[in-house]
Amino acid sequence: MDTKNVIAAISLSAAVIILYSLFFAPSPKELKDLNQEKTALNSEAPKLDVSEKIIEISREDAIKDSDRIKFENENIKGSISLKGGIIDDLIFKNYTETLDGQNNITLLSPKKFSQGYYVETGWVSSSKNIDLPNSKTIWKVDGNNKLAPNQSVTLSWSNNQGIVFEKIIQIDENFLFSIDQKIENKSNKSYDFYSYGQIIRNKSPDITNFYILHEGLIGVFDDQLVEEDYDDIKEKEFSKNASSGWLGITDKYWITTLIPEENKEFRADFDFKNKFRANFIETKPLTLVSNGSISSNVRVIIAAKEVDVIDNYAENSKISK
């Protein structure tokens, strides 16, 4: 190839690169969005410690293991552990184990009990070297210490980096908890956060095995119903990105669900690592600037499968059935 041809080839290559840069290459904003999406995909709710053994202690002793705030309305009663801010004690007041009215139905229990079944909410961050609240964090009660309809409870925790975390928890007259998670930044740094929620169950319950009745992990994602049996999740995990919906664990008569904040994209995961887990994490970060604040809402429904109640939530809370 002579010198003229070499120069022509180089010129043509340069022209192609320039044209691509002008018309096809992603803009700085698009690159930032792509990086954020990549970060979100690599972020996930906190890993369960697969080496953690289920400690065979009584439910009563497990309840006593941490300080608690009590909650009660016309349908449910129980408590929230201040260690982790976990909903792990829930009893149905109007349903009993036997026809003679003995022993109210207990659904949620602490993780140290063999039949542990509980709900956690919180934050993860793509920012390194930041202390975050976790399942062992001891939350402080600010003000009112009993949760009831029209009587919220505020929990707070501060790290040593100038970041203050809050959970403002409300309950309605039936089965709905609303958790507003807030973070205030008193430092001179900025951080990215992703809100998450997860339902964890130590063991699968006794299954009815009635072919038209699903018991296991369940969700509706962008109007698509997903049902996964306990045995199926042991063999293969499930993951799906969505912009609307809910997820949870369902029994024959009871259901525990998480509802991510409306109009926020999230990824849902069902998995088993010594425990069953249904969780979601928002896939777009909230940036917490210096002297700023951010918030995210998670709704939790822990309910008896009463048709009227479920229909009411579906209609008034925009929850897909």
Please annotate each region the language model reported:
Residues 72-75, 79-320:
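Soluble non-transmembrane domains of integral membrane proteins
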Residues 10-21:
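Hydrophobic membrane-insertion alpha-helices, especially the h-region
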Residues 1-9:
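Membrane interfacial helix-start segments of signal peptides and signal-anchor transmembrane helices
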Residues 1, 40, 142-144:
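Aromatic/His-enriched, Gly/Pro-containing loop or helix-boundary segments
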